[in-house]
UniProtKB/Swiss-Prot annotation:
It comes from Sulfurimonas denitrificans (strain ATCC 33889 / DSM 1251) (Thiomicrospira denitrificans (strain ATCC 33889 / DSM 1251)). This is Guanylate kinase. The lineage of its organism: Bacteria, Pseudomonadati, Campylobacterota, Epsilonproteobacteria, Campylobacterales. Transmembrane segments: none annotated. Belongs to the guanylate kinase family. It is an enzyme of class 2 (transferase). It comes from the Bacteria. It catalyses: GMP + ATP = GDP + ADP.
Amino acid sequence: MNHKTGAILVLSGPSGAGKSSLIKEVIDDIGECYFSISTTTRPIREGEVDGVHYHFVSESEFKKDIEDEFFLEYAVVHSNYYGTSIKPVKKALKSGKLVIFDIDVQGNATIINRLGDITTSVFISPPTLSELKKRLEARSTDTKDVIERRIEMAKREMQRVSEYDFLIVNDNLQEAAKTLRIIADAARVKIPSNEINDFVRSWEDI
Protein backbone atom coordinates (compact mmCIF):
# COMPACT_ATOMS: atom_id res chain seq x y z
CA MET A 1 0.00 0.00 0.00
CA ASN A 2 1.51 3.32 -1.11
CA HIS A 3 -0.03 6.10 0.98
CA LYS A 4 1.01 9.59 -0.15
CA THR A 5 -2.03 11.69 0.70
CA GLY A 6 -1.56 14.55 3.13
CA ALA A 7 -3.17 14.44 6.54
CA ILE A 8 -4.99 16.80 8.88
CA LEU A 9 -4.32 17.41 12.57
CA VAL A 10 -7.00 19.42 14.36
CA LEU A 11 -6.16 21.09 17.67
CA SER A 12 -8.97 22.53 19.77
CA GLY A 13 -9.40 23.70 23.32
CA PRO A 14 -10.54 26.63 25.42
CA SER A 15 -8.89 30.00 25.07
CA GLY A 16 -6.11 29.84 27.65
CA ALA A 17 -5.46 26.11 27.27
CA GLY A 18 -2.01 26.84 25.86
CA LYS A 19 -2.59 25.76 22.27
CA SER A 20 -0.34 28.44 20.76
CA SER A 21 2.51 27.67 23.17
CA LEU A 22 2.16 23.96 22.46
CA ILE A 23 2.19 24.45 18.70
CA LYS A 24 5.27 26.67 18.96
CA GLU A 25 6.98 23.97 21.05
CA VAL A 26 6.48 21.17 18.48
CA ILE A 27 6.24 22.85 15.07
CA ASP A 28 9.94 22.38 14.23
CA ASP A 29 9.94 18.72 15.27
CA ILE A 30 7.04 17.20 13.35
CA GLY A 31 8.35 17.24 9.81
CA GLU A 32 6.90 18.89 6.73
CA CYS A 33 3.65 20.58 7.65
CA TYR A 34 1.42 23.54 6.88
CA PHE A 35 -0.12 25.52 9.72
CA SER A 36 -3.48 26.81 8.57
CA ILE A 37 -3.78 30.51 9.37
CA SER A 38 -7.35 31.44 10.21
CA THR A 39 -9.07 34.60 9.06
CA THR A 40 -10.79 36.57 11.82
CA THR A 41 -12.68 39.77 12.51
CA ARG A 42 -11.48 40.07 16.12
CA PRO A 43 -9.14 42.94 17.03
CA ILE A 44 -5.43 42.28 16.71
CA ARG A 45 -3.67 41.78 20.05
CA GLU A 46 -0.34 43.19 21.14
CA GLY A 47 2.49 41.10 19.68
CA GLU A 48 0.38 39.58 16.91
CA VAL A 49 1.29 39.99 13.23
CA ASP A 50 -1.25 40.03 10.41
CA GLY A 51 -0.64 37.06 8.12
CA VAL A 52 1.37 35.20 10.77
CA HIS A 53 -1.00 34.67 13.67
CA TYR A 54 -4.23 35.42 11.78
CA HIS A 55 -5.47 37.19 8.69
CA PHE A 56 -7.30 40.15 10.24
CA VAL A 57 -10.24 41.50 8.23
CA SER A 58 -13.37 43.57 8.75
CA GLU A 59 -16.75 41.92 9.28
CA SER A 60 -17.94 43.10 5.86
CA GLU A 61 -14.87 41.54 4.19
CA PHE A 62 -15.46 38.28 6.05
CA LYS A 63 -19.11 38.11 5.02
CA LYS A 64 -18.11 38.73 1.39
CA ASP A 65 -15.68 35.79 1.62
CA ILE A 66 -18.52 33.62 2.96
CA GLU A 67 -20.63 34.55 -0.08
CA ASP A 68 -17.70 33.69 -2.36
CA GLU A 69 -17.36 30.24 -0.65
CA PHE A 70 -13.81 31.10 0.37
CA PHE A 71 -13.91 29.08 3.59
CA LEU A 72 -13.61 25.39 4.34
CA GLU A 73 -15.30 26.15 7.67
CA TYR A 74 -16.20 29.22 9.67
CA ALA A 75 -17.84 30.04 12.99
CA VAL A 76 -18.78 32.92 15.25
CA VAL A 77 -16.95 32.83 18.59
CA HIS A 78 -17.36 35.53 21.26
CA SER A 79 -19.10 37.73 18.64
CA ASN A 80 -16.12 37.47 16.25
CA TYR A 81 -15.91 35.52 12.99
CA TYR A 82 -13.21 32.89 12.41
CA GLY A 83 -12.71 30.95 9.18
CA THR A 84 -10.35 28.57 7.38
CA SER A 85 -9.42 29.24 3.74
CA ILE A 86 -9.88 26.34 1.32
CA LYS A 87 -7.19 26.83 -1.35
CA PRO A 88 -3.97 26.66 0.72
CA VAL A 89 -5.31 23.62 2.59
CA LYS A 90 -6.00 21.74 -0.64
CA LYS A 91 -2.57 22.65 -1.99
CA ALA A 92 -0.80 21.44 1.17
CA LEU A 93 -2.74 18.16 1.24
CA LYS A 94 -1.98 17.51 -2.41
CA SER A 95 1.74 17.89 -1.71
CA GLY A 96 1.50 15.35 1.11
CA LYS A 97 1.91 17.74 4.04
CA LEU A 98 0.43 17.48 7.51
CA VAL A 99 -2.07 20.35 7.75
CA ILE A 100 -2.49 21.67 11.29
CA PHE A 101 -5.66 23.49 12.33
CA ASP A 102 -6.15 25.50 15.51
CA ILE A 103 -9.96 25.69 15.49
CA ASP A 104 -12.90 25.45 17.87
CA VAL A 105 -15.29 22.54 18.42
CA GLN A 106 -17.67 23.81 15.72
CA GLY A 107 -14.84 23.91 13.20
CA ASN A 108 -13.69 20.43 14.18
CA ALA A 109 -17.16 19.02 13.56
CA THR A 110 -17.17 20.58 10.08
CA ILE A 111 -13.70 19.26 9.22
CA ILE A 112 -14.61 15.76 10.46
CA ASN A 113 -17.78 15.86 8.35
CA ARG A 114 -15.92 16.91 5.20
CA LEU A 115 -12.47 15.34 5.61
CA GLY A 116 -12.81 12.88 8.47
CA ASP A 117 -10.97 10.07 6.70
CA ILE A 118 -7.66 11.93 6.86
CA THR A 119 -8.27 13.87 10.07
CA THR A 120 -6.90 13.24 13.56
CA SER A 121 -8.35 15.48 16.26
CA VAL A 122 -6.87 16.54 19.59
CA PHE A 123 -8.55 18.46 22.41
CA ILE A 124 -6.15 20.42 24.60
CA SER A 125 -7.30 21.33 28.10
CA PRO A 126 -5.86 22.98 31.18
CA PRO A 127 -5.96 20.68 34.24
CA THR A 128 -8.82 22.51 35.98
CA LEU A 129 -11.32 25.31 35.51
CA SER A 130 -9.61 27.37 38.21
CA GLU A 131 -6.28 27.04 36.37
CA LEU A 132 -7.95 28.21 33.16
CA LYS A 133 -9.32 31.28 34.93
CA LYS A 134 -5.88 32.01 36.38
CA ARG A 135 -4.28 31.83 32.91
CA LEU A 136 -6.88 34.09 31.33
CA GLU A 137 -6.47 36.70 34.04
CA ALA A 138 -2.66 36.53 33.77
CA ARG A 139 -2.77 37.38 30.04
CA SER A 140 -4.20 40.83 30.85
CA THR A 141 -5.62 41.10 27.33
CA ASP A 142 -9.33 40.71 28.11
CA THR A 143 -11.85 42.53 30.26
CA LYS A 144 -13.56 40.79 33.17
CA ASP A 145 -16.72 40.32 31.07
CA VAL A 146 -14.75 38.75 28.21
CA ILE A 147 -12.99 36.38 30.63
CA GLU A 148 -16.35 35.29 32.04
CA ARG A 149 -17.66 34.62 28.52
CA ARG A 150 -14.55 32.59 27.72
CA ILE A 151 -15.03 30.54 30.89
CA GLU A 152 -18.67 29.81 30.04
CA MET A 153 -17.62 28.85 26.51
CA ALA A 154 -14.94 26.56 27.94
CA LYS A 155 -17.54 24.76 30.05
CA ARG A 156 -19.60 24.09 26.91
CA GLU A 157 -16.55 22.99 24.92
CA MET A 158 -15.56 20.50 27.62
CA GLN A 159 -18.88 18.73 27.10
CA ARG A 160 -17.71 17.82 23.57
CA VAL A 161 -14.29 16.36 24.35
CA SER A 162 -15.59 12.88 23.47
CA GLU A 163 -15.84 14.00 19.81
CA TYR A 164 -12.03 14.04 19.64
CA ASP A 165 -9.54 11.23 19.04
CA PHE A 166 -7.17 12.39 21.78
CA LEU A 167 -7.18 14.53 24.93
CA ILE A 168 -4.04 16.30 26.12
CA VAL A 169 -4.15 17.84 29.59
CA ASN A 170 -1.69 20.71 29.31
CA ASP A 171 -0.39 21.00 32.87
CA ASN A 172 3.24 20.48 31.82
CA LEU A 173 4.30 21.99 28.49
CA GLN A 174 7.18 19.58 27.81
CA GLU A 175 5.10 16.48 28.56
CA ALA A 176 2.17 17.79 26.52
CA ALA A 177 4.52 18.55 23.61
CA LYS A 178 5.96 15.04 23.77
CA THR A 179 2.46 13.57 23.50
CA LEU A 180 1.51 15.87 20.64
CA ARG A 181 4.61 14.86 18.64
CA ILE A 182 3.59 11.20 18.94
CA ILE A 183 0.04 12.00 17.82
CA ALA A 184 1.33 14.02 14.86
CA ASP A 185 3.43 11.06 13.71
CA ALA A 186 0.37 8.80 13.98
CA ALA A 187 -1.76 11.29 12.03
CA ARG A 188 0.62 11.09 9.08
CA VAL A 189 0.13 7.34 8.67
CA LYS A 190 -3.65 7.29 9.12
CA ILE A 191 -5.05 5.57 6.04
CA PRO A 192 -8.31 6.79 4.43
CA SER A 193 -11.13 4.24 4.47
CA ASN A 194 -11.33 4.09 0.66
CA GLU A 195 -7.68 2.99 0.51
CA ILE A 196 -8.31 0.40 3.21
CA ASN A 197 -11.31 -0.92 1.28
CA ASP A 198 -9.24 -1.09 -1.92
CA PHE A 199 -6.57 -3.08 -0.09
CA VAL A 200 -9.12 -5.51 1.36
CA ARG A 201 -10.69 -6.06 -2.07
CA SER A 202 -7.30 -6.74 -3.66
CA TRP A 203 -5.88 -8.78 -0.78
CA GLU A 204 -6.76 -12.20 -2.25
CA ASP A 205 -5.78 -11.30 -5.80
CA ILE A 206 -3.01 -13.43 -7.27
